[in-house]
């Protein structure tokens, strides 16, 4: 594991990124972007174990299963890429969880309201701070509606604890 700069971090704010690697797959976790929607650990609990440290154990499933699960992440908190020499078919690693995924422009952005939870934004979107600085550009954004988040305007899962 290592720390690095988050490429989608808020302007001027250093965020932590954790790296998990095998010979065939590199997984990045940006904890400050995570809304704790639980898609990862509900889909692949043998890899994503929130109660353990480290909480990601890549040996628990095939790289292809991990890739499919990361592609379900609604916040871009989990990302992946294939290292040089990976045996994984590159065509399988083109989804929204890929570090190389390009956000395609859409005509409409879809915003879903979660009962007693956040707003799920799907589609090419950009979020700007009050000074006009771009703080996030993504195809998956989860916005806080409860006001408890420590990562405004993004949901950090704080509503689960009230």
Where are the model-predicted features located?
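Short Cys/His-rich "knuckle" micro-motifs
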Residues: 42, 51-53, 81-83, 153-156
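Ferredoxin-like iron-sulfur electron-transfer modules
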Residues: 14-35, 48-68, 82-89, 132-142
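Cysteine-centered iron-sulfur cluster-binding motifs in ferredoxin-type domains/subunits
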Residues: 28-44, 60-76, 112-114, 144-153
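Iron-sulfur (Fe-S) cluster-binding modules
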Residues: 1-24, 89-91, 95-98
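Short, structured motif recognition centered on aromatic/hydrophobic residues
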Residues: 121, 141-143, 154-155
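Short Fe-S-cluster ligation motifs
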Residues: 3-7, 58-85, 99-123
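A short, structured beta-strand/loop element
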Residues: 38-46, 50, 118-133
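Short histidine
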Residues: 15-16, 150-162
């Amino acid at each position: 594991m290592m720390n690095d700069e988050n490429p989608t971090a808020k302007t001027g704010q250093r965020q932590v990124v954790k790296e998990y690697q095998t010979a065939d797959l590199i997984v990045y976790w940006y904890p400050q972007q995570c809304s704790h929607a639980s898609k990862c650990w509900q889909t692949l609990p043998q890899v994503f174990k929130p109660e353990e440290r480290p909480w990601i154990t890549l040996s628990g499933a095939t790289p292809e299963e991990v890739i499919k699960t990361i592609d379900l992440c609604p916040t871009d908190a989990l990302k992946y890429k294939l290292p040089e020499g990976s045996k994984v078919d590159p065509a399988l690693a083109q989804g929204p969880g890929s570090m190389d995924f390009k956000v395609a422009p859409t005509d409409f952005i879809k915003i879903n309201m979660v009962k007693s939870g956040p707003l799920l934004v799907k589609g090419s979107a950009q979020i700007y701070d009050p000074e006009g600085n771009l703080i996030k550009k993504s195809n998956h954004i989860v916005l806080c509606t409860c006001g408890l988040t420590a990562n405004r305007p993004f949901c950090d899962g704080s509503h689960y604890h009230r």
